Amino acid sequence: MSDSKVNMVSPPEGLTGEGFFATKLNDVVGLARANSLWPLPFATSCCGIEFMATMAAHYDLARFGSERVSFSPRQADMLLVMGTISKKMAPILRQVYEQMSEPRWVIAVGACASSGGVFDTYSVLQGIDKVIPVDVYVPGCPPRPEQIVDGVMRLQELVKSESVRRRSSPEYQELLASYNIS
């Protein structure tokens, strides 16, 4: 995962012993967030079946901190969009995203969510990044559970390295404004 070294320091005044280390609050918050992501599956086709396998005992996504699958956007911070999204479904997906509290992350699982897949028609959204910002793309049609786990692990690395203040930065606000999200 991370190759950061632990900075061992001498104990604070008045204390004796070994094993004291110094870190930044940013690192602690990043580690806590990365290992406690609550997924919200938004599945419309076969990628959802692969996600079910990912949550089952053999692959067990809970080992990576995603113990509690939420079916309420208000209680989730990781949106997994799986499958074909029609243009009529796009406003609903966007509404689900907007109902999630900050910080929130999005994983586009499979070819359909990433680029429309084989459905290059007038009624299919050609990638969910047309309506919401995406943090990680998982390729495949459908992707194997191992690939979904890898996508979650990549998101964890992104979350760990993200500054506590990034979500309130002008750059992030500009990104949301480009999607007309306040």
From Swiss-Prot:
Q: Which GO terms describe its biological process?
A: aerobic respiration; electron transport coupled proton transport
**NCBIfam families attached here?**
nuoB_fam (TIGR01957), PRK06411.1 (NF005012), PRK14820.1 (NF011395)
Q: Which GO terms describe its molecular function?
A: 4 iron, 4 sulfur cluster binding; iron ion binding; NADH dehydrogenase (ubiquinone) activity; NADH:ubiquinone reductase (non-electrogenic) activity; quinone binding
Name of protein: NADH-quinone oxidoreductase subunit B
Q: Is Cytoplasm given among the entry's keywords?
A: no
Complex formation: NDH-1 is composed of 14 different subunits. Subunits NuoB, C, D, E, F, and G constitute the peripheral sector of the complex.
Q: Where in the cell is it found?
A: Cell inner membrane
Q: Which transformation does this protein catalyse, written as a reaction?
A: a quinone + NADH + 5 H(+)(in) = a quinol + NAD(+) + 4 H(+)(out)
Task: Relay the cofactor remark from the entry.
Answer: Binds 1 [4Fe-4S] cluster.
Q: Enzyme group, top EC level?
A: translocase
Gene Ontology, cellular component aspect: plasma membrane; respiratory chain complex I
Q: What is one Pfam family matched by this protein? A: Oxidored_q6
Which residues of this UniProt protein bind [4Fe-4S] cluster?
C46, C47, C112, C141
Family, per the entry? Belongs to the complex I 20 kDa subunit family.
Q: Which UniProt keywords apply?
A: 4Fe-4S, Cell inner membrane, Cell membrane, Iron, Iron-sulfur, Membrane, Metal-binding, NAD, Quinone, Translocase, Transport
The cofactor required is:
[4Fe-4S] cluster
E.C. code: 7.1.1.-
Give the main location. Answer: membrane
What does this protein do, in the record's words?
NDH-1 shuttles electrons from NADH, via FMN and iron-sulfur (Fe-S) centers, to quinones in the respiratory chain. The immediate electron acceptor for the enzyme in this species is believed to be a menaquinone. Couples the redox reaction to proton translocation (for every two electrons transferred, four hydrogen ions are translocated across the cytoplasmic membrane), and thus conserves the redox energy in a proton gradient.
Q: Output the InterPro entries linked to this UniProt entry.
A: NADH_UbQ_OxRdtase-like_20kDa, NADH_UQ_OxRdtase_20Kd_su
Domain of life according to the entry: Bacteria
Q: How does it sit in the membrane?
A: Peripheral membrane protein
